[in-house]
Amino acid sequence: MYMYAIMDTINHPKERNMDKLYIVIPAYNEQDNIEQVINDWYPVIEKHNGNGQSHLIVIDDGSKDSTYEKLKQCTKTRPLLIPITKPNGGHGATVLYGYKYALKNGADYIFQTDSDGQTLPEEFEPFWKRRQKYDMVIGWRKDRQDGISRVFVTKTLKLVIRICFGVNLTDANTPYRLMKAETMARYIHLIPKDFNLSNVLLAVIYKKKGCSIKFLPVTFRPRQGGVNSINMKKICKIGKQAVIDRK
């Protein structure tokens, strides 16, 4: 048995828990949800702890409520949790801030989800198992439970991306994605720091650059609180910017 363990270490020098995972979660005015979100996702970072180097990064985007204070309270019993606060810049800018923080601190893999309770940590493992095969594994909200208007917005965004960028992406803006840090490091500079839909543009860039992308179906529950980060105005803006960039 001991010999098998040695051979397994030789054949697989970088074990599962040696990969440094950074989970990035933006939060804005989520005082009613944030503790539950931490309770949900902290076990994931504990399991994939990267020999103590993995972290759950929750970025308070200038909340006007007690979101950040509650985050700090949560750190007392959760050493892998790192709360960050910054001036309000919107979801896209906050996600980008988190990605850059993860890259700067040596992440091997970066996972992003939101703080509204719509996603399930129980569905993370299929993403993690595919981490080495794909540059990006994105959730596909096959059966959305957050209303027909949100389905319409997603379909409209998909059409805008196809028209403006000439690529087809199943669900470009899903806040449930696992990414190789080394791939992200090559392309993140192409995204403006104040861009509203950073995840969308990142997926488009990966597709245009020929990176490997895999979509997996995920559950997407009704929003537990807060305000949606994407709307028709923002979709029109990304389309307008794409037209300008192509001139």
Q: What residues fall within each predicted segment?
A:
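Short beta-strand/loop segment that forms part of the nucleotide-sugar
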Residues: 50-62, 85-87
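Short beta-strand-to-loop acidic/aromatic patch adjacent to the donor-nucleotide binding site
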Residues: 107-116
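Conserved donor nucleotide-binding strand/loop of the catalytic core
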Residues: 68-105
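Acidic helix N-cap motif at the loop->helix transition within catalytic regions
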Residues: 32-36, 65-74
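Conserved catalytic loops of nucleotide-sugar-dependent glycosyltransferases that act on lipid-linked
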Residues: 90-95, 99, 147-247
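Short, well-formed alpha-helical segments that are part of the catalytic scaffolds
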Residues: 30-46
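Conserved donor NDP-sugar-binding/catalytic core segment of glycosyltransferases
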Residues: 125-148
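A conserved acidic beta->alpha catalytic loop
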Residues: 60-69, 117
